[in-house]
Amino acid sequence: MNAPLPMNAAAQGARPTLAELEARDAFAARHIGPDSAEQQHMLKVLGFESRAALIDAVVPAAIRRRDGMSLGEFTAPLTEEAALGRLRALAGKNRVLKSFIGQGYYNTLTPGVILRNIFENPAWYTAYTPYQPEISQGRLEAMLNFQQMITDLTGLDIANASMLDEGTAAAEAMTLLQRVNKHASNTFYVAEDVLPQTLEVVRTRALPLGIEVKVGPAADAAQAHAFGVLLQYPGVNGDVADYRAIAEAVHASGGRVVAAADLLALTLIAAPGEWGADVTVGNSQRFGVPLGFGGPHAGYMAVKDEFKRSMPGRLVGVTIDAQGNKAYRLALQTREQHIRREKATSNICTAQVLLAVMASMYAVYHGPQGLKRIAQRVHRLTATLAAGLKTLGHTPLNATFFDTLTLETGFNTDAFHASATARGINLRHVDATRIGISFDETASRDDVIALWEIFAHGKAVPDFDTIEASVQDGFPATLARQSAYLTHPVFNTHHAEHEMLRYLRALADKDLALDRTMIPLGSCTMKLNATSEMIPVTWPEFSNIHPFAPLDQTVGYREMIDQLEAMLCAATGYAAVSLQPNAGSQGEYAGLLIIHAYHASRGESHRDICLIPSSAHGTNPASAQMAGMKVVVVACDENGNVDLADLAKKAEQHSKNLAAIMITYPSTHGVFEQGVQQICDIVHKHGGQVYVDGANMNAMVGVAAPGQFGGDVSHLNLHKTFCIPHGGGGPGVGPVAVGAHLADFLPNQDSVGYRRDENGIGGVSAAPFGSASILPISWMYIAMMGSAGLTAATENAILTANYVARRLSPHFPVLYTGQHGLVAHECILDLRPLQKATGISNEDVAKRLMDYGFHAPTMSFPVPGTLMIEPTESEALHELDRFIDAMIAIRGEIARVEDGSFDREDNPLKHAPHTAAVVVSDKWNHKYTREEAAYPVASLRTQKYWPPVGRADNVYGDRNLFCSCVPLSEYAED
């Protein structure tokens, strides 16, 4: 695989055949970075003659895949052009109608400057979560803008940097209130007019936690004596209710209030924080993010200040750098799941950063007046529609409204829907006798007239201008918003496109993403996100489809989804896949709920013990806790492998109640454990199920399959193994794959009519197919690689990791290796001995790498004081060597600390990264030169990345928590 590109014969002087000239470039040769010669060079360094020989030495023979991994019609790879053509044909089977369905999803107009310069820009979509703040200042600022936008519009004190969707945000709000409110009740009360998909996600979350969800009129909320109450604002049927008295009564009963609020409506109606909401959640989709058949979209959560340390997800804060300048960073990280582990109450990692950035920039571009004008237009058209419908004998059931009307249609509902569809319009099917209409920023007076004609029954429609001139607001004046919002200069400056374009460019220039350099983060798989894979995402046939559109309008989507599910089954060896989970954390959670449902179906619902190795990622114990399981930790031996004796002991001890074990394979230590089948056998012997975390699947596709060596269920990370970009912290897709015996329990979304099986668990995401619009990325990758290409990618991922480990091992100890001293697809460098000898920490090395133009490897996971490196198959030998040379040079700098030629405190590592401002300053008091600081290797003279800030002060940032946009005065001081 990865043979030289066509024309090789001609390049050597031979006359190419016509067949060679007609051959299109194989995509695998574009995706896999090292060419054949470079692969042979690396193999020679490792002492192997072929990739096959290397894989034989790395992967245990007992689990090696020998079946060729048939992908059916996609076994042979398609060219980029052919794959795009095949997918275009599927997209053409979808029908794009104007959807006035609403129910939390709306048509929107994405400004071209945002579409081209964020959504389609690899500087934004190939970045990783901003754990290294010094090289992430651009998107941290954009995320802070999002937080400011949310706090302003909701009237609350602090917001996080996005949630997975509105349903998940509401479920997280429920568990947050249960945690912080010491109320005797175990009841969460949900108003009957919440979005139905939100209610289902809340119920799914509540069930394993023993929370009772009661549904009823909002007016009865206080009588429920619940610890929390969820109110929709406006309601799903359009009502804009005054909740002040209800919120006061709930508070008097000891409860707390969650508002699920529409951001555009909040530009006109009173903010939830002003009428008593303690938490506000929702979706920012209508701020410029396409429908996408349900996602990805950035949910949000805002809370009162007293709840900030209990809030899930990422939180961006302001701090200072080493020179005292302002800087942004992720704040309060000690509350997150990867640190709290089984004590966590949420497993949310990063969520939907790319989409949050888009939504925030929509607000930046339009500004407060622009948003208000859009909202006023939507509301005016809705009011005009309502007034005209009244003249035609259709008085809306909701007396108040912002953008949504609900009509009683008797038994003519189907006829009205058919008439609307014939005009290219989708309406909401409420039930057999009611129809909903929700307007958005794409609505026009022509749409109003068309809807009048649909409901006219042959009557003459009224004159638009006459009706419009007399309409009044659809909500009471007492609910009209009085408070200002989006007053910060960032929302009042960049309205001209040139200004917006340059602002986005300035932010992107501050960051390091894959468009500039390799990102060698272990356990993150920062591989190529090929342009051809990204192109279909913005096709209208994929991006402009409502998630609840009629089935006959989404035929192409469903065929593509069916094909992708089959591809993933082939890759994993499992029998069935659900694409609903919209993050790896949600895939984990779904998998454990499936295991619980399976045990319950066999009369063994008492099985609630989840065994988890001590080396596991923090999401594993957090997910187990969310699924209602009790975590029992299994020890690992000195080589990082699961201690089989300890496993056997604990499996025996908990045999009657054993639900599952969660293992990662290859292990989080970067090796293929020899005893994985024994692990599976031990757990199965005691009635448990085996959950194989798919975070490291990039080391197994085509080589080994968890569904074949003993796994019962896995989640995958399409944003790792299957090329969906990380987006700076989302979006992601975390499909859950299961064996045949678990297939009946895959998630439904009954609230919107999506049911796989009557035994399926409830919805874990708001939309039936989660982040559907980015699924074409993985479809394209698999179709273009084919079976052999995917296998070659895996083999090269293992090859590059071992090459890096071998070349760096004389300089840094490689902490764990498998058989024959080899690693899987990543390696861990142990810096603890160096820190003990010199005081130089893994953080110092990480920050120094920025001066060399690199993103740091993963720090202190899974072992404190280490760096974990995953180079992936997409990096060419030149880039691998550039990184290796940088690490060796840094080791040389550490040696100078050891021998005393560098001061232990005043050296280039302790003061890294070095900004341009520091290097050119008249003041230079360091005991090393400016050249040693800025240009440690000669190659940097021709291509140099300058970090925009010095080392961020984490302690200062958490002690002086500030999570809103910096006042203008601060910019003046800079």
Curated annotation (Swiss-Prot):
Cofactor(s) required, per the database record: pyridoxal 5'-phosphate
Keyword Oxidoreductase: yes
Matching Pfam families: GcvP2_C, GDC-P
Cross-referenced SUPFAM superfamilies: PLP-dependent transferases (SSF53383)
Stretches of the chain forming a coiled coil according to its record: none
Modified residue annotations for N6-(pyridoxal phosphate)lysine: 720
EC number per UniProt: 1.4.4.2
Gene Ontology CC: cytosol; glycine cleavage complex
Entry's Gene Ontology molecular function annotations: glycine binding; glycine dehydrogenase (decarboxylating) activity; pyridoxal phosphate binding
Highest rank taxon of the organism: Bacteria
Reactions performed catalytically: N(6)-[(R)-lipoyl]-L-lysyl-[glycine-cleavage complex H protein] + glycine + H(+) = N(6)-[(R)-S(8)-aminomethyldihydrolipoyl]-L-lysyl-[glycine-cleavage complex H protein] + CO2
InterPro entries: GcvP, GDC-P_C, GDC-P_N, GDC_P, PyrdxlP-dep_Trfase, PyrdxlP-dep_Trfase_major, PyrdxlP-dep_Trfase_small
Family: Belongs to the GcvP family.
Known role: The glycine cleavage system catalyzes the degradation of glycine. The P protein binds the alpha-amino group of glycine through its pyridoxal phosphate cofactor; CO(2) is released and the remaining methylamine moiety is then transferred to the lipoamide cofactor of the H protein.
Quaternary structure and partners: The glycine cleavage system is composed of four proteins: P, T, L and H.
Protein name: Glycine dehydrogenase (decarboxylating)
